[in-house]
Structure formats: structure tokens, C-alpha cells
């Protein structure tokens, strides 16, 4: 099952939701503002990142700039606690399943969440 972590006001989040819905891909939606991610959720996501916290922290967010914190000097537990307290620190949307992770919306990359049969049929239809 696909988990879509988002905030409703985020344009990229709305695009990701619309894309998944239009391709009839089942997903569970998690509003990170009303249902903050647990530290276990965050740890699970971090295990799938290529660059660790760098991939999930939005250094351009207003919250990040207001906090003026150096994430490189935080322990992982301190960082997870901070993100749990301030979910707007996260880049969004976060889309994940058992094999894939995507941070942000990218129409080419989100295709990885399509079932293999769907992708195969789509490829065959472009060859004809």
C-alpha cells in the first residue's frame, strides 16, 4: 500500500494526490499537520533516503528559517523530535511504499508507484 504524506495547502501534494487518483492507484493519505508523523514513520522513511535528513528537511521553509537550527549538529533523536513538533520542516509530499520513496512531486518518478502490469501495458501501447 502507498502512503502519501502531505499538507492540504501544498500544491505539489495536491498534484501527487490527483495523479494517484487519476491513475487509480490506491493510497492512504496522511495529513502531516493534523496527524504528525511518528518517530517510527520518520525512521522508516529515512532508511529509504539516499542522503538521509538532507532529503526530507525543507531548508527553504519558513519554519526552518524561523527556528534557525543547524540540523547537522542535532542527534537523530533531536531531529526526529523537532520534525514531530514542527511537521512543516518536511519536504512534501512524501510518497512511499514497501520498495519506493519519492520526496516532492515529479511526474516521471511517481510512475514507479504504478503496478508493473499497468506500466507494461502502457509501454506496449506506445510501441504500436
UniProtKB/Swiss-Prot annotation:
Signal peptide (from-to): none
GO cellular component: cytoplasm
CDD domains noted in UniProt: ArsC_Spx (cd03032)
Regions annotated as coiled coil: none
InterPro entries reported in the protein's UniProt record: Arsenate_reductase-like, Spx, Thioredoxin-like_sf, Tscrpt_reg_Spx/MgsR
Matches recorded under HAMAP family: Spx (MF_01132)
Entry similarity comment: Belongs to the ArsC family. Spx subfamily.
NCBIfam families referenced in this protein's UniProt entry, alphabetically: arsC_related, PRK01655.1
Protein name per UniProt: Global transcriptional regulator Spx 1
Annotated gene: spx1
Amino acid at each position: 500500500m502507498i502512503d502519501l504524506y502531505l499538507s492540504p495547502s501544498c500544491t505539489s501534494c495536491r498534484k501527487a494526490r490527483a495523479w494517484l487518483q487519476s491513475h487509480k492507484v490506491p493510497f492512504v493519505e496522511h495529513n502531516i499537520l493534523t496527524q504528525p508523523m511518528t518517530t517510527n514513520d520518520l525512521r522508516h522513511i529515512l532508511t529509504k533516503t539516499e542522503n538521509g535528513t538532507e532529503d526530507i528537511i525543507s531548508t527553504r521553509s519558513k519554519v526552518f528559517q524561523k527556528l534557525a537550527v543547524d540540523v547537522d549538529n542535532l542527534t537523530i533523536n533531536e531531529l526526529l523530535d523537532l520534525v514531530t513538533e514542527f511537521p512543516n520542516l518536511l519536504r512534501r509530499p512524501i510518497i512511499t511504499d514497501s520498495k519506493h520513496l519519492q520526496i516532492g512531486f515529479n511526474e516521471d518518478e511517481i510512475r514507479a508507484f504504478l503496478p508493473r502490469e499497468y506500466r507494461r501495458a502502457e509501454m506496449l501501447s506506445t510501441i504500436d
